[in-house]
From Swiss-Prot:
Source species: Pseudomonas savastanoi pv. phaseolicola (strain 1448A / Race 6)
Subunit comment: The complex is composed of two ATP-binding proteins (XylG), two transmembrane proteins (XylH) and a solute-binding protein (XylF).
Alphabetical keyword list: ATP-binding, Cell inner membrane, Cell membrane, Membrane, Nucleotide-binding, Repeat, Sugar transport, Translocase, Transport
Keyword rRNA-binding: no
GO cellular component assignments: plasma membrane
Protein's UniProt name: Xylose import ATP-binding protein XylG
Locations listed in the record: Cell inner membrane
EC number: 7.5.2.10
Lineage per the UniProt record: Bacteria, Pseudomonadati, Pseudomonadota, Gammaproteobacteria, Pseudomonadales
Membrane disposition: Peripheral membrane protein
Record flagged with keyword Thylakoid: no
Amino acid sequence: MSDYLLQMNGIVKTFDGVKALNGIDIKVRPGECVGLCGENGTGKSTLMKVLSAVYPYGTWDGEILWDGTPLKAQSISETEAAGIVIIHQELTLVPDLSVAENIFMGHELTLPGGRMNYPAMIHRAEVLMRELKVPDMNVALPVSQYGGGYQQLVEIAKALNKKARLLILDEPSSALTRSEIEVLLDIIRDLKAKGVACVYISHKLDEVAAVCDTISVIRDGKHIATTAMSDMDIPKIITQMVGREMSNLYPTEPHEIGEVIFEARNITCYDVDNPGRKRVDDISFALKRGEILGIAGLVGAGRTELVSALFGAYPGRYTGEVWLDGQPVDTRTPLKSIRAGLCMVPEDRKRQGIIPDLGVGQNITLAVLDTYSKMTRIDAEAELGSIDREISRMHLKTASPFLPITSLSGGNQQKAVLAKMLLTRPRVLILDEPTRGVDVGAKYEIYKLMGALAAEGVSIIMVSSELAEVLGVSDRVLVIGEGQLRGDFINHELTQEQVLAAALSHPDAPDNNARKTA
């Protein structure tokens, strides 16, 4: 019998004559966690679709061996029956069904006569959740009553209920808090100890390094290297992913910081569902020309609510004023904000940043479509010229501007959203989690773009949950905790520990004034 549970040998997958996968080899042992690394669009998802029979046997070339035996699955149900289970980035739970019903979906336990055996399903669900160190979960409640971290564990329980021997985790931590991520990584370690193998796909290379035994890197559809994690570090992984050495993940573009041009005064946001509760409590700050201002804080601190209110996109009631060039401006709707010179790239790219049914180019010019209007028609030639320039400037990878934007990788979709906002020629640009779900190469390009914009005099407000990112690109850092401003720091030798201490402190604590800007 083979030492390997899974062997994928020489996998080739072609779309319209173009090889999306070109001879990929992947091997996984029982109890081993393999990190599958590569930039967006390099073929990671395509490879996993081949493995799980989303692309059935016969639609690709190469060989898959499962426990040493050729696997020629024609459907997902066949691969799941073999013990191969994928947990996708977009969770597949049904919100209104109970935890137990979600765990057993498609594999329900029944009584004679066909009725559901709910007591047995609840008991088994409780056993599974105890194995995942969640003994107090009420599995009879709707899964919607639990947060993202718990829902991720329900997905894992669902996979284990299918007798998973190989668990494929695709960006499993994208919506989790730091503490929830640590729980997830501990559970993966426990599963490994029980002999369950894992393929871990994530742009968060610190997680990959923490939990994976082996790293397999693919680039442009080709297998670059498979290396023991003990012989690797994060810079080496990045070099293999992008094909060049990156001496500094956070490139710095020299830029002069000028006078104050933007002020947020006494911004208060009230909870949408509980109008008596403040999500943002009387926050004021100023922003200078060419300055990059990072906003840090724990999840739920009120960062997104604050910047949404500044842009006129907060769905609840809010108060306060926005000033530009020493004058109050009306930013009560996104359209008014854009006209005033204030633009925002939202946190939820898929729901708020793009229109899925439109092409790449149409999404890029959407905010300035009136610029190309001639009476009752659009000047298509002028519009296409702008689209081509933005695609070139953003290094946006697309075969055609007429392709659906959903055909692009996450990083290229984000570049398209950025291009759309930059066509409005903003003076103040708000970026809410600009690199979430974006690979390391695209992150680098976004950081370079931010520096170049600041050098041109554009002022930038960036919200990020990654403290290393905040400290890596910001000139100044605001720290928000429980809806209140907890610190305003010049980013000179500022540490993650200092930012976290401010986020967790009482607003009147004396340490909050350390490094505080004038």
